Amino acid sequence: MSIVKMKRLRIFGMASDCEELLRKLQHLGCVELRAPTQPSSDPGWQGFTAKSDGELANAQLRMDEFRTTLERLKRCSPTNKKGRFPSRPRITERELFDRQIVLEAEETVERVAALEKKRDSICAEQNKLIGQREALTPWLGLDVPLDTASTKHVLVLFGTLSGLASHQAVEAALAETTELCQVQWAGRAGELQYVLVLCHRKAGEAARDALKSFGFTATSFRGWKGTARSNIDQIEDRQRILSQELEACRARLAQEAGHQTALQICIDRMTQDIQRMEAKEKLLSSTSTFFLEGWVPAEQLSDVEHLLSQYSAAWEATDPEPDEYPQVPVKLKNNRLTRPLNMVTDMYVYPAYDGVDPNPLMAPFFIFFFGMMMADMAYGLLMLAGGIFMRRKLRPSGTMEHMAGLLILCGISTFVMGALTGSFLGDFLPRLAKLIRPDTTFTALPALFTPLTDTLAILIGSLALGLLQVLTGMAISVVRKVQAGTWTDALWDEGTWWSILAGVALAVVGIGNLGGYPIVLLIGLLMLLYGGTRNAKGFGKLTALIGTVYNGATGFFSDILSYARLMALMLAGSVIAQVFNTLGEVSGSVAGFVIISLVGNALNFMLNLLGCYVHDLRLQCLEFFGRFYKEGGKPFRPLLINTKYVDIKEED
């Protein structure tokens, strides 16, 4: 349970072996590649260059096509019959890189693209027909072909008038102008009236002038033949045909949904190919050779050595120099108990390569503190069930895998603390028993202590736990400083406070006094004064003295007081649960009590789950890590097979 030692790996190999070697390094999954840092002035390196071609860009474009097609099929696929949480397929590495899968996926992309294009074309034509139908509907009352044209003596005008114009006023205005004019009213739509005006050509200008006062606008029916009714009938016939074609297209898309698995496998395979291409761009290449540089865990160096022995390659693995530590990637080596705490470390910042792995040191505190704040058997069971479900059903990886493990560990802690405080959804069970049987003697679950009656004891215990964790952090700091050869810093920094705390404890019990004075405490105070001013000079000693006393005392004791939140969250969760149980009990019925209590406790559970995690995280990152943690590390990211949709199993 520590930070894994790294070796800097350098490889010279034949260019013809480069692709195969990268594939096998990806299979091993233990080498992180980096861009070589060789001096460009060295003539021996003039033939080596970093090469970048369009292969990576083309692969990324193909990946986008596969992903787009997969999303389209997800939208078009029928209800998943495998359930809401289908298991991820398990395939071998050979099946992942099977060329046939890629061909099947590419054919699916082409078919889906063609079907999507056809569907879009059908939808566009449907929208066009809808617009045409809406335009023709107001003319249904006119039994005159829309392609009726003017003749030598008769002027034919299709158009619209303002909806405010009355029939009598329009006809009277035309009659005053000429007797050689007739109006046929087709219909109304919105604020317009649709009309057909027939008049003698000699009276055409006069008729137009009369109609202008009523907002007349001419309408053209280019391309339309026959009456509005006949055209709408044709449109409806075409719409029925298009609807059938659209349904057939959607049915074919739904059938293509059966190829989602092939697309997912292909996406995972393309992800690995792109990773190798990105790694390849970090190499230096000449016409016949290549140079590779990276990091490998010392414990896995033998695997890399065995692989390289199969190729015509020269290589070396060296320990990093201290000035290289900031560039060395960090890999944490933890067991099943402490590995889920990577979720906390990832959210904060990785330790430096020459630092210390915080997970095993933090695990007992984080898990116990979380359970102490939640402290409910039902909540613990829910967390435990959720973590087990995620692991067995979803089989997550990365952060989600750590979350599942953390839910299990914190769920166990929450259940245990809930058993000690006698809490199961607060006081749900005793209140339910009282509603069912008012004369019951079951008034509470057995408890070692309860948040409402033992608040002061819990507060003292919280502060004691805080003191224990702070002292643990100080002890780790002492060990690190002694290992680094700065034992004087350990003496004046941590040793001072240990002397003060020991002196206070001895003074309280009356031990270690000399002439009525607490000697150990006085020694600690003198160490505080000297240690804080030992590097200052002149007037700076006074300011350093004031700063040391003020910042040291307030900082140390404020850190301890921060742990009062353990009691506060335990008390808050317990009170909220009991309040909802009381509200449910007021209903007077078992059903009402159960519904109100469960809804309220569900809300309390979700709020506490987030609140306890955030406050626990704060205690670890500020109060605990602040004592010893050296940050600045970069997580180890090797070239490996990392899949999203499938799980890789061993070859038979």
List the predicted regions and their residue ranges.
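Long, charged N-terminal accessory/stalk domains
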Residues: M1-M362, S397-A404
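Conserved, carboxylate-rich catalytic/transport cores that coordinate ions
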Residues: S2-R8, S16-L22, Q26-L33, S302-D652
